[in-house]
Design a protein with these regions (language model features):
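Thiamine diphosphate
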Residues: 1-200
Length: 201
């Protein structure tokens, strides 16, 4: 079956995370990057799709980009690009989140700066409503969850500061029913890897 037609997806094989030892310092996004790559490699039957408006490398998803590559019409030599790439990058937040939401039979990840995420809210809410209606009709959705990862958080105050910060999406999703949307704030790499695996259920 084509990934776009598949609606009942078995839970993926989730590799054991590469745990960081207590007291070590590391980037939660780098840990998530490594774990997502291992998740994709452990599940070749699931078509991967990564939605990203901009700056996947700045978000420390280097291994994901190197493996899956930007989808482009004319790939440049020496750049992580391919005509069949699984990373959909466009300065259109609605388009990239919808690329992941439409991949019902696949393994998805959406990553964006926090300030760009509110533009994804409409599509995410419609997906939540559609899924809830399916459950109420006795035909619960059988696809995997779509993790949406926000970076440059309001409380982080790194190099991009306020221009990349806006907690609107997290606040809006906290108001949704917990049966359809979960909001997590992983404080470190270990919890980020667990949150990623848990979000697929």
């Amino acid at each position: 079956d084509h990934a776009l037609a598949t609606r009942q997806v078995a839970l993926p094989t989730v590799p054991e995370p590469t745990w960081a030892e207590p007291g070590t310092v590391g980037s939660p996004m780098s840990a998530l990057d490594t774990h997502f790559v291992r998740l994709v490699q452990a599940n070749p039957q699931l078509r991967p799709r990564v939605g990203n408006p901009d700056e996947l490398r700045s978000n420390k998803l280097d291994a994901t980009l190197d493996l899956l590559k930007h989808r482009v019409q004319v790939p440049e030599a020496g750049v992580a690009e391919s005509r069949t790439g699984a990373v959909i990058t466009a300065l259109n937040e609605e388009a990239v989140v919808c690329a992941a939401l439409a991949n019902k039979g696949g393994l998805n990840l959406v990553v964006t700066y926090e300030a760009f995420a509110p533009k994804m809210l409409g599509a995410l809410r419609q997906e939540l409503i559609f899924s809830r209606h399916l459950r109420e009709a006795g035909r619960p959705p059988g696809w995997l969850g779509v993790p949406v990862v926000l970076t440059s958080h309001t409380w982080e105050n790194a190099k991009n500061e306020q221009s990349h910060q806006d907690p609107t999406l997290a606040e809006a999703l906290l108001g949704e029913m917990a049966d359809g949307a979960r909001v997590c704030f992983p404080p470190d790499g270990n919890s980020a890897m667990v949150a990623l695996a848990h979000s697929l259920r």
